[in-house]
Amino acid sequence: MVLFIPGFMQRGDAWRPVAELLPERYPSRLLDHAEHSFEGRLGEILSSSASVLVGYSLGGRLALRAALRSPDSFTAVVVVGSTAGIEEGPLRVQRVEADEKLASWIEAMPIEDIVALWERQPLFADQSDLLVEEQRPGRLSQDPRSLALLLRTAGQGTLDPVWHELRTLDLPLLAIAGARDDGYSAAAKRIASTAPHARAAIVEEAGHAPQLQQPAAVAELITRFLDDVANG
């Protein structure tokens, strides 16, 4: 089974446009997290009985760490718009401070204001108004306290980087990024050059969320990758 893992402020349904395009030979499940801490969400993934993990952004970071913690549980991993972490100490400290500031603000604000701020991020500037509107109900269904806890326990500054560990990951790994997302395109290529059985794929006409902007292209990349894994 393919387990689709959502990003921050998403429900599993955000993956539906891609999941519905996978062939029947790859049944899937869209994960709706009941837990809102890093360890809680990692536990959900590890107990899911999935053989393939597909995660976006935060979901990708979770997928990598699940695979590293229990590599024998999985046959392949796909990460989209994700990274193995921030290595530079000063940058990590800055990110922790920024995430804590945001978490404190989130705890004090209504979800409507939180979503409005989230949607104004430069990272999502290339997404169409229609795409943003389609994602909004899932974002508005989030609980602010849960979002704050997730930031504090699973933020990029909080989590230790796992670049070194990736060198020993004995699993097929596909790292996907949008061509308009320079930072995560670079991260995908680095993942591909670090893990021994990894490859990168850059999706044209897409930014940080290629699975939303180009779902058919992402579904095709995942299908080809899983076919290659199945064929040895």
What feature does the model see in each segment?
Residues L53-G55, V80:
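Short beta-strand immediately N-terminal to the catalytic nucleophile in serine-hydrolase-like folds
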Residues M1-H36:
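Conserved HGGG/HGGXW glycine-rich cap/lid loop of the alpha/beta-hydrolase fold
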Residues F38-S51:
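Conserved acidic catalytic loop of the alpha/beta-hydrolase fold
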Residues L3-G7, Y56, A177:
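The conserved beta1-alpha1 loop
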